Amino acid sequence: MQTTVIGIGETGMGKSSFLNAYLQKNAFQASDSPDSCTKMTSVDSNIINNQTRKAIDTPGIKDTDNTDQENVRQLVEFLLNYADGINVVAIVLNGQVDRYTRDTEKFIKIAHQMFNHPDFWEHLCIIFTKWYSGMNEEQKRIKQEE
């Protein structure tokens, strides 16, 4: 069995880090910087407990390098070929932001339009990242060494 997750969200939210954790390997370049790491939609996979996990990393909306239109165009083009194989749409949000924004609503609407599937809501997952940012320096060092 194969489970495929696509990460969607703003630049700097932790999409690549989340997908690396899901795959249990460093498949995608990730950093704590608010600048974009992901330039193009990319795919990687790993076999964990005899189950194939596939992850799709996407450039962020509000990207620091490309325009939103270019990133959305790139994503739509990619999805035309792969949308049927995606099991989970993960909207990745910064857990330190304490409110729901219009941008969050926009991401969910864009994802819903892109997939245009009657069961979309059953496959949507909201992921909150960056909880570790409240750690002191020693805790961060230990976390990075893990």
Where are these regions (language model features)?
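Conserved GTPase G-domain substructure that encodes guanine base recognition and part of the catalytic core
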Residues: 1-146
